[in-house]
Amino acid sequence: MCRWFRRKKQGQPQLTPAPVPNGEDYWNSKYPKTVVVYEGRELPNTGMIAVDVRDFFININDYQLQEVAQKLQGLSDDEKALECLRWVIANITYVADKTEYGLEEFWCYPNELLKTKKGDCDDGAILLANLMLAAGLPYWKVRLTAGAVPEGGHAYVTYYYEDGSRWVALDWCYFPNVDAVKDRPDYKNSPIYLEVWFSWNLKYAFCAGVKGEITLKKVRFL
């Protein structure tokens, strides 16, 4: 039967619109939900600490986040997303974990990065996603994404464009594009973002083909 309509058992056929892939339930169910535990924080004399990646979303009412987010009131979701990206690009300096902490990998929480103002790709991406939620964007439209780019592992934000047509990349350091959201292509069609390893929002994590819990060892992010 054509997927665009369902025929009643009796009477004339009626056309029923197919589900439109632009809502919270659709996107939270499109891929298997996974608990991603990532060894992303290395501490001196302790070694790697495994953390549920969702824990990198903190309280959106955190006063440091709100100092930035309150300036974005009255803007559309797309405008808020872009202004959050521009703020991170303008206020955070890219510094490798090895240089800043003497560690191979150290994912910062947003309030830590707001204190130091220095970090690498994952740190800025985590801060950006938290700023977007603090500014009022729906949680399911904001995903932190970890995957491959031509030079190695990379973390960035993917955002669901307000018109419901595509997910776009918001990247503060590897490809710091400040073009309007409407002018950005679907990130999956980009020659820059080659492969997604896992992604997550405030509530759920996703890893293609994986259900249940998965523990990922340290990956060197840019």
Question: Model-predicted segments: where are they?
Answer:
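A structural boundary/capping signal
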Residues: 1-222
